Amino acid sequence: MKFQPLGKRVLIEREEESNKTASGIIIPDNASKEKPSTGKIVEVGTECDCVKAGDKVAFAKYSGSELTLGDKKYLILNLEDVLGIIK
């Protein structure tokens, strides 16, 4: 199943956030609330010209609407909620 966002929206596959550091320290949920989320852009809307499919981006943690296609979960975000491209 395919989804094409309209206007200035993007479809993002969110990366799983780890609550444990590389050294094994567990970070409580309330300690990382202000940290932005990251994900990969899967599809871009018809009016998006500054990002493209495949870009890894940072976005506000609680932004967007969840969408399930098949067995995968995605987020639909307004382009203005994307904070930047991670290179």
Curated annotation (Swiss-Prot):
Gene3D superfamilies: GroES chaperonin. It is found in: Cytoplasm. GO terms for biological process: chaperone cofactor-dependent protein refolding. Its main location: cytoplasm. Keywords: Chaperone, Cytoplasm. The keyword ATP-binding does not apply. One of its GO terms (molecular function) is protein-folding chaperone binding. GO terms for cellular component: cytoplasm. Heptamer of 7 subunits arranged in a ring. Interacts with the chaperonin GroEL. Belongs to the GroES chaperonin family. NCBIfam families: PRK00364.3-3 (NF001537). Together with the chaperonin GroEL, plays an essential role in assisting protein folding. The GroEL-GroES system forms a nano-cage that allows encapsulation of the non-native substrate proteins and provides a physical environment optimized to promote and accelerate protein folding. GroES binds to the apical surface of the GroEL ring, thereby capping the opening of the GroEL channel. This is Co-chaperonin GroES. It comes from Campylobacter hominis (strain ATCC BAA-381 / DSM 21671 / CCUG 45161 / LMG 19568 / NCTC 13146 / CH001A).
